Amino acid sequence: KYQYQTPIGAPAYAVGALTVLGMIGGLYGMFIPHATVKASGEELPLIPVDPAKKQVDWDHYGNDAGGSRFVALDQINRNNVSKLKEAWRFRTGDFTTGTGNGAEDQMTPLQVGNKVFLCTPHNNIFALDADSGKQLWKAEVNSKADAWERCRGVAYFDSTKALTQPTLAGATPVTAVATNTQCPRRVYTNTPDGRLIAVNADTGERCKDFGVNGTVDLLEGLGDGTKAPRFEVTSAPTIAGTSIVVGSRIADNVGADMPGGVIRAY
């Protein structure tokens, strides 16, 4: 005796049709203008910065050693930020090579005193006058990599400044360093081709007493297969006390023998 049975594909087609309709509706909604959502509640007043805590430098990638990313200044605020005008512009002459895997300018500069320190996609370092934007010195590094050429920032260290000791109970004290060196103030950069370089923050010259003539080979001891883009260093070095902490970027799905990620301090 024949008995009609619902084809197995019918429910699947129905679910598929509903899914497609939902996707079309979501795509359509992306292009519909939405009303501005305003914050509710009372607007908080602007609180003046305590003159004793007024910040004068941005000497770490994230502003301070703790990476707070917020600056204790109130000269520019929500009431006057719309009136800002460009004071100066500086061109490094180091060209990018397009988006994607090429050279890109992704740098966050540092400001220490009246100097601004910045780096180019090929790790050339510049010191500029903060008021005029004029070049004070240039340290040529000219790093090269097959892909992912970028310098996201530099690190600054002044051995003549008093060290900030940790306040956490049981923490290891920060070890003091010599102050009578060739470079009492230094700027550090790490490159995509695996180098950590130190230059004199006052002159831009290599610090010969660091590593080998101012350079540490970050590929040493990592084994084979470390050529960029397998192993690269693009993020700014981190100054932790008197140590320079360096990370790494490992490419995905390039080979079966990829190098391991490594974090080191010098």
State the predicted function of each range.
Residues 81, 111, 129-130, 191, ...:
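Short, acidic, Ser/Thr-enriched surface-loop or helix-capping motifs
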Residues 193, 199-204, 259-266:
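Beta-propeller blade signature
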